[in-house]
C-alpha cells in the first residue's frame, strides 16, 4: 500500500472567502455584498427623513414650519432643502457650516443633503442587490436594468437639477406637498408639460399602466379551467410546472380585436419592460436639460424678444398666462433670497390660482 504525503487539495479559506460565504449565505433576508451599501444607506435615509419630518423646522431656510412638532400633517411635513446661500455645500456635520453642532446642522438643512445622498446610494445598492441575486441564481439581469429607471429619475431630479442651478435650494424637498410645489415650479419656470421629454415620460408611464391592465386581464381571461377550486387561487398547485393560461387563445382574441397581437411571450414581456423604463429615462434626460436651463420649450426666449423688440409678434397663449401666474404667485415666497416684491395689481386674486 502506498501512502502519499502532501498538502490537502482543498486550500484553506482566506478572510475574503469567509466573509463572502457569510454575506451570501442562504437566509430569510439575503444580505450579499450589495447589502453592505444598501442596508446602511437605506437605514440612514429613512431615519433622516423620519427625524426631519418629526422634529426639524424649515424656518431658517424657507421661513416655513415643516415638522409634526410644529403642527404639520403627513401631507405638509417635509425635510426641506438648504438655503440658497449655501449653494452646493455637502453640509457635512463636521463641515465649516455646522462645525459639529447637530442642532445648527439641522437648522441649516443638513438633513436634506444627508437624506438625498444616502437615498441615492441606497437605490444604487438595491439595484446591485438585484444584480447579485440574479447572478447567484443564474437569472438574466433585467430586473436590475429596469430599476435603473427610477434611479435615473431620482438622480436627475434631486441631484443633477439642483447642481445645474445655483444650489440645493432648488431641488425638491422630501415631502408630499413639497413635491407638488416642485412640479408647479417646473411648470412655471420651465414649461415642463410642453417639453417632449416629459411627453415621452407620460406616454411611458400611462402606456405601461395600460399594458399592465391589458396583460393582467388577458391572463385572467384565458386561465385553463382544469382545477376543482372555487376561484383562481385554489384551482392550481402553486408549484406546478405546466402553464396556467392559453397564449394561443389570447393571441386569437387580440388578433380579432386589433388585427394584430403578440405571438411571443418574450417579445410581449420585453415590450412591457421597455415602455416604462424608456419613458422614465426620457424624463430623466429632459430634467438634465432643464438643469442646464435649455430654453427650447419654455417661451421665455419669445417673451424676451417681444419685450426688447416692439415689432416682434408672438402668440400670447393661455399657456404663457398660466406660467406667468405661477411665477408671480410662487417667486416671492419660493425665492426669498431674491427679495422679490410684486405690486398687488399683478398678483393673482381670489380663486384665480
UniProtKB/Swiss-Prot annotation:
Location within or outside the cell: Plastid, Chloroplast thylakoid membrane
Single GO molecular function: chlorophyll binding
EC number in record: 1.10.3.9
Catalytic activity line of the entry: 2 a plastoquinone + 4 hnu + 2 H2O = 2 a plastoquinol + O2
A Gene Ontology cellular-component term: chloroplast thylakoid membrane
Topology relative to the membrane: Multi-pass membrane protein
Transmembrane segments: 41-61, 125-141, 153-166, 208-228, 279-295
Residues involved in a plastoquinone binding: 215, 262
UniProt binding sites for chlorophyll a PD2: 198
Pfam family, one: Photo_RC
Amino-acid positions noted as binding Fe cation in the UniProt annotation, renumbered to this chain: 215, 269
Sequence positions bearing Phosphothreonine: 2
Keyword annotations from UniProtKB, A to Z: Acetylation, Chlorophyll, Chloroplast, Chromophore, Electron transport, Iron, Magnesium, Membrane, Metal-binding, Oxidoreductase, Phosphoprotein, Photosynthesis, Photosystem II, Plastid, Thylakoid, Transmembrane, Transmembrane helix, Transport
Family: Belongs to the reaction center PufL/M/PsbA/D family.
Note in the entry: 2 of the reaction center chlorophylls (ChlD1 and ChlD2) are entirely coordinated by water.
Name of this chain's protein: Photosystem II D2 protein
Amino acid at each position: 500500500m502506498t501512502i502519499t504525503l502532501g498538502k490537502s487539495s482543498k486550500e484553506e479559506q482566506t478572510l475574503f472567502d469567509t466573509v463572502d460565504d457569510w454575506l451570501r449565505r442562504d437566509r430569510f433576508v439575503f444580505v450579499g455584498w450589495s447589502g453592505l451599501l444598501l442596508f446602511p444607506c437605506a437605514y440612514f435615509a429613512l431615519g433622516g427623513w423620519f427625524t426631519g419630518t418629526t422634529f426639524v423646522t424649515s424656518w431658517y431656510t424657507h421661513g416655513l414650519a415643516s415638522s409634526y412638532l410644529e403642527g404639520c400633517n403627513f401631507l405638509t411635513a417635509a425635510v426641506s432643502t438648504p438655503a440658497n446661500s449655501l449653494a452646493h455645500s455637502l453640509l457635512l456635520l463636521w463641515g465649516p457650516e455646522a462645525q459639529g453642532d447637530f442642532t445648527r446642522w439641522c437648522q441649516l438643512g443638513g438633513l436634506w443633503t444627508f437624506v438625498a445622498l444616502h437615498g441615492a446610494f441606497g437605490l444604487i445598492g438595491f439595484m446591485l442587490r438585484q444584480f447579485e441575486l440574479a447572478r447567484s441564481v443564474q437569472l438574466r439581469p433585467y430586473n436590475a436594468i429596469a430599476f435603473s429607471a427610477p434611479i435615473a429619475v431620482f438622480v436627475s431630479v434631486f441631484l443633477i437639477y439642483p447642481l445645474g442651478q445655483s444650489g440645493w435650494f432648488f431641488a425638491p424637498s422630501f415631502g408630499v406637498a413639497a413635491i407638488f410645489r416642485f412640479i408647479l415650479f417646473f411648470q412655471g419656470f420651465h414649461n415642463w408639460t410642453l417639453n417632449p421629454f416629459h411627453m415621452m415620460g407620460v406616454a411611458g408611464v400611462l402606456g405601461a399602466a395600460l399594458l399592465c391592465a391589458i396583460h393582467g386581464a388577458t391572463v385572467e381571461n384565458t386561465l385553463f379551467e382544469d382545477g376543482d377550486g372555487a376561484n383562481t387561487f385554489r384551482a392550481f398547485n402553486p408549484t406546478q410546472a405546466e402553464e396556467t393560461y392559453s397564449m394561443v387563445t389570447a393571441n386569437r382574441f387580440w388578433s380579432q380585436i386589433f388585427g394584430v397581437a403578440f405571438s411571443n411571450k418574450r417579445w410581449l414581456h420585453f415590450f412591457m419592460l421597455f415602455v416604462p423604463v424608456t419613458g422614465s429615462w426620457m424624463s430623466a434626460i429632459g430634467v438634465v436639460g432643464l438643469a442646464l436651463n435649455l430654453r427650447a420649450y419654455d417661451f421665455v426666449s419669445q417673451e424676451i424678444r417681444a419685450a426688447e423688440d416692439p415689432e416682434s409678434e408672438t402668440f400670447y397663449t393661455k399657456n404663457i398666462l398660466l406660467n406667468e401666474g405661477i411665477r408671480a404667485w410662487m417667486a416671492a415666497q419660493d425665492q426669498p433670497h431674491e427679495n422679490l416684491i410684486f405690486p398687488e395689481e399683478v398678483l393673482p386674486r381670489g380663486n384665480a390660482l
